[in-house]
Protein backbone atom coordinates (compact mmCIF):
# COMPACT_ATOMS: atom_id res chain seq x y z
CA UNK A 1 0.00 0.00 0.00
CA UNK A 2 1.33 3.42 -0.92
CA UNK A 3 1.03 5.85 1.97
CA UNK A 4 0.89 9.64 1.84
CA UNK A 5 1.76 11.31 5.14
CA UNK A 6 0.17 14.69 5.77
CA UNK A 7 1.31 16.46 8.93
CA UNK A 8 2.57 19.67 10.48
CA UNK A 9 4.42 18.31 13.53
CA UNK A 10 8.20 18.38 13.77
CA UNK A 11 10.06 15.09 13.48
CA UNK A 12 13.66 14.08 13.88
CA UNK A 13 13.10 11.45 11.23
CA UNK A 14 10.21 11.19 8.79
CA UNK A 15 8.42 7.88 8.19
CA UNK A 16 8.87 5.86 5.04
CA UNK A 17 6.09 6.98 2.71
CA UNK A 18 5.26 7.34 -0.95
CA UNK A 19 4.88 11.10 -0.34
CA UNK A 20 5.09 13.48 2.60
CA UNK A 21 3.08 16.70 2.52
CA UNK A 22 4.52 19.03 5.15
CA UNK A 23 4.76 22.82 4.84
CA UNK A 24 7.92 23.04 6.90
CA UNK A 25 9.72 20.83 4.37
CA UNK A 26 9.01 23.17 1.46
CA UNK A 27 11.42 26.09 1.08
CA UNK A 28 8.93 27.74 -1.30
CA UNK A 29 5.74 27.64 0.78
CA UNK A 30 5.37 31.14 2.27
CA UNK A 31 3.52 30.33 5.52
CA UNK A 32 4.81 27.40 7.56
CA UNK A 33 2.33 27.42 10.48
CA UNK A 34 -0.65 25.66 8.94
CA UNK A 35 -1.94 22.41 10.38
CA UNK A 36 -2.31 18.98 8.83
CA UNK A 37 -6.05 19.56 8.45
CA UNK A 38 -5.45 22.43 6.03
CA UNK A 39 -2.94 20.33 4.13
CA UNK A 40 -5.49 17.51 3.90
CA UNK A 41 -8.11 20.01 2.70
CA UNK A 42 -5.75 21.31 0.01
CA UNK A 43 -5.00 17.77 -1.17
CA UNK A 44 -8.72 16.89 -1.22
CA UNK A 45 -9.56 20.08 -3.15
CA UNK A 46 -6.89 19.26 -5.69
CA UNK A 47 -8.14 15.70 -6.12
CA UNK A 48 -11.79 16.82 -6.30
CA UNK A 49 -10.97 19.68 -8.66
CA UNK A 50 -13.07 22.06 -6.58
CA UNK A 51 -13.38 23.72 -3.19
CA UNK A 52 -15.86 22.18 -0.78
CA UNK A 53 -17.45 24.32 1.98
CA UNK A 54 -17.86 21.38 4.35
CA UNK A 55 -14.25 20.23 4.03
CA UNK A 56 -13.18 23.87 4.34
CA UNK A 57 -15.15 24.06 7.61
CA UNK A 58 -13.42 20.94 8.94
CA UNK A 59 -10.03 22.47 8.08
CA UNK A 60 -11.01 25.55 10.10
CA UNK A 61 -11.88 23.34 13.08
CA UNK A 62 -8.54 21.54 12.88
CA UNK A 63 -6.75 24.88 12.83
CA UNK A 64 -8.41 25.85 16.11
CA UNK A 65 -8.12 22.41 17.72
CA UNK A 66 -4.41 22.22 16.86
CA UNK A 67 -4.00 25.67 18.43
CA UNK A 68 -2.33 27.14 15.35
CA UNK A 69 -1.61 30.89 15.36
CA UNK A 70 -4.55 32.85 13.96
CA UNK A 71 -2.50 34.94 11.58
CA UNK A 72 -1.94 35.02 7.83
CA UNK A 73 -3.45 32.04 6.01
CA UNK A 74 -4.89 30.55 9.22
CA UNK A 75 -6.81 33.71 10.05
CA UNK A 76 -8.45 33.97 6.64
CA UNK A 77 -9.22 30.24 6.50
CA UNK A 78 -10.83 30.17 9.95
CA UNK A 79 -12.82 33.32 9.22
CA UNK A 80 -14.19 31.87 5.98
CA UNK A 81 -14.81 28.47 7.60
CA UNK A 82 -16.84 30.11 10.38
CA UNK A 83 -18.89 31.91 7.73
CA UNK A 84 -19.64 28.59 6.01
CA UNK A 85 -20.54 26.88 9.30
CA UNK A 86 -22.96 29.64 10.29
CA UNK A 87 -24.57 29.63 6.82
CA UNK A 88 -24.75 25.90 6.11
CA UNK A 89 -25.55 24.34 9.54
CA UNK A 90 -23.87 20.96 9.03
CA UNK A 91 -25.54 18.18 11.03
CA UNK A 92 -22.28 16.76 12.41
CA UNK A 93 -21.22 20.14 13.78
CA UNK A 94 -24.67 21.16 15.00
CA UNK A 95 -24.80 18.03 17.15
CA UNK A 96 -21.47 18.89 18.80
CA UNK A 97 -21.70 22.65 19.28
CA UNK A 98 -24.66 22.71 21.68
CA UNK A 99 -28.03 24.39 21.50
CA UNK A 100 -28.37 28.07 20.60
CA UNK A 101 -24.65 28.48 19.89
CA UNK A 102 -23.08 30.44 17.05
CA UNK A 103 -19.88 29.30 15.41
CA UNK A 104 -16.86 31.32 16.49
CA UNK A 105 -13.33 30.52 17.60
CA UNK A 106 -14.49 30.06 21.20
CA UNK A 107 -17.24 27.57 20.39
CA UNK A 108 -14.90 25.68 18.07
CA UNK A 109 -12.16 25.56 20.71
CA UNK A 110 -14.30 24.79 23.74
CA UNK A 111 -17.45 23.07 22.45
CA UNK A 112 -16.51 21.14 19.32
CA UNK A 113 -12.76 20.41 19.40
CA UNK A 114 -12.65 18.78 22.87
CA UNK A 115 -15.40 16.35 21.89
CA UNK A 116 -13.57 15.37 18.71
CA UNK A 117 -10.21 15.19 20.47
CA UNK A 118 -11.62 13.01 23.26
CA UNK A 119 -11.62 10.11 20.80
CA UNK A 120 -7.83 10.39 20.64
CA UNK A 121 -7.41 11.10 24.35
CA UNK A 122 -9.20 7.93 25.46
CA UNK A 123 -8.76 5.65 22.44
CA UNK A 124 -9.41 2.48 24.41
CA UNK A 125 -13.05 3.57 24.80
CA UNK A 126 -13.82 4.14 21.13
CA UNK A 127 -13.50 2.90 17.61
CA UNK A 128 -11.81 5.80 15.78
CA UNK A 129 -13.41 4.63 12.53
CA UNK A 130 -16.74 5.80 13.96
CA UNK A 131 -15.43 9.36 14.05
CA UNK A 132 -14.26 9.10 10.44
CA UNK A 133 -17.71 7.77 9.45
CA UNK A 134 -19.37 10.53 11.52
CA UNK A 135 -17.72 13.25 9.44
CA UNK A 136 -18.73 11.82 6.06
CA UNK A 137 -20.92 14.29 4.19
CA UNK A 138 -23.79 11.82 3.73
CA UNK A 139 -23.73 10.37 7.25
CA UNK A 140 -26.92 8.71 8.48
CA UNK A 141 -28.69 11.05 10.92
CA UNK A 142 -29.39 8.31 13.48
CA UNK A 143 -25.73 7.25 13.45
CA UNK A 144 -24.60 10.89 13.74
CA UNK A 145 -26.80 11.45 16.78
CA UNK A 146 -25.50 8.27 18.42
CA UNK A 147 -21.82 9.17 17.83
CA UNK A 148 -22.28 12.79 18.93
CA UNK A 149 -23.83 11.59 22.19
CA UNK A 150 -20.95 9.17 22.64
CA UNK A 151 -18.43 11.97 21.95
CA UNK A 152 -20.06 14.07 24.67
CA UNK A 153 -19.93 11.11 27.07
CA UNK A 154 -16.26 10.40 26.35
CA UNK A 155 -15.38 14.07 26.71
CA UNK A 156 -17.16 14.18 30.09
CA UNK A 157 -15.15 11.13 31.14
CA UNK A 158 -11.94 12.87 30.04
CA UNK A 159 -12.89 15.99 31.99
CA UNK A 160 -13.65 13.93 35.10
CA UNK A 161 -10.33 12.08 34.88
CA UNK A 162 -8.47 15.35 34.36
CA UNK A 163 -10.18 17.01 37.34
CA UNK A 164 -9.56 13.95 39.50
CA UNK A 165 -5.85 13.89 38.66
CA UNK A 166 -5.53 17.64 39.18
CA UNK A 167 -7.14 17.30 42.61
CA UNK A 168 -4.79 14.41 43.49
CA UNK A 169 -1.76 16.44 42.45
CA UNK A 170 -2.82 19.41 44.56
CA UNK A 171 -3.51 17.23 47.59
CA UNK A 172 -0.16 15.47 47.32
CA UNK A 173 2.02 18.45 46.54
CA UNK A 174 3.93 20.96 48.56
CA UNK A 175 2.54 24.47 48.50
CA UNK A 176 5.26 25.78 46.17
CA UNK A 177 4.80 28.37 43.44
CA UNK A 178 6.12 25.90 40.86
CA UNK A 179 4.42 22.54 40.61
CA UNK A 180 5.63 19.51 38.69
CA UNK A 181 4.16 16.06 38.96
CA UNK A 182 4.81 12.77 37.22
CA UNK A 183 2.81 9.62 37.78
CA UNK A 184 3.15 6.63 35.49
CA UNK A 185 -0.37 5.55 36.45
CA UNK A 186 -1.99 8.70 34.99
CA UNK A 187 -3.60 8.06 31.61
CA UNK A 188 -1.51 9.64 28.84
CA UNK A 189 -4.62 11.17 27.27
CA UNK A 190 -5.23 13.47 30.20
Each language-model region and where it sits:
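Hydrophobic helix-and-loop "lid/oligomerization" segment in the mid-to-C-terminal part
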Residues: 1, 48-190
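Short hydrophobic alpha-helical runs that function as membrane-insertion/retention elements
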Residues: 2-6
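Short, ordered loop/turn segments at secondary-structure junctions
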Residues: 8-11, 23-26, 184-185
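Short alpha-helices
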Residues: 14-65, 72-74
Amino acid sequence: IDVIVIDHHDYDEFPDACAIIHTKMSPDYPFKEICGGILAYKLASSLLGKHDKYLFSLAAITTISDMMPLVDENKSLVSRGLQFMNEEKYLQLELLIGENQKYNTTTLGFNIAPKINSFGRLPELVNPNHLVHYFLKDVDQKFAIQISQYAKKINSKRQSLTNEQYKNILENSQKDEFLYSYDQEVHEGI
